[in-house]
Amino acid sequence: MSKGNILFILYGILTLTLCGGDAFHLIPRVIRAFKGSSDRIKKQLGIGLQVSSITMTAFYILLLYIWKFTFYEMKAPVALEMVIWLSALVRIVICFLPQNNWCSDEGNRKLSIIRNAVFAVTGIGVIILYALSGNTYGYHMTRMVAAILISFGCYLPVTLLSKKMPKIGLLMIPKTCAYIWVIVMGLQLLFAAAC
């Protein structure tokens, strides 16, 4: 299988992971913002948050492998790759803990801070990789760094404040737009490789 085919498959999986994961929490957030909350919406949002927390972690692991196949002549520092993998696995394990209380109003602030701090480590690791590659092959991957920074800039306030200020959850929309930008960059790379 050629490098182009592998990248095409990885970007396809990345897109499905993004769309599937975000749909689980965006739809209940939009409904809650316009119609108010109910027990049903709270449960849907709680499950959606858990699912999207796991899928977004997988999203960053996929970005790691996309980087490796795009910049195949570059080697990711072993320590950095280990940090990305370890932090991602720790976050996924934390996401499965019932103590998260995903479907309750209270949640678990301590676990939320821990799992999102670990997620930030994963994201920073991926940011470093794309910053290292920069404009290699004329791909302008510094834009990937910008997209990830925007997504975290929108995600963190929602994580910290959405229980007290539900409408801040609408910041997940620009976060999703930043991730769509990641997908568009992938399509541009694939079309450039095909030419």
Language-model features: where?
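Juxtamembrane boundary at the C-terminal end of a transmembrane helix
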Residues: V184-C195
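Short juxtamembrane and helix-loop transition motifs at transmembrane-helix boundaries
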Residues: S38-I47, E73-A79, N101-K110, L132-G138, ...
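Early transmembrane hairpin module of multi-pass membrane proteins
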Residues: K3-A79, L170-I173, I180
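Membrane-helix boundary/juxtamembrane motif in polytopic membrane proteins
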Residues: E106-A117, Y130-A146, P166-I173
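Transmembrane helix-loop-helix
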Residues: L7-Y11, F71-W85, L132-A147
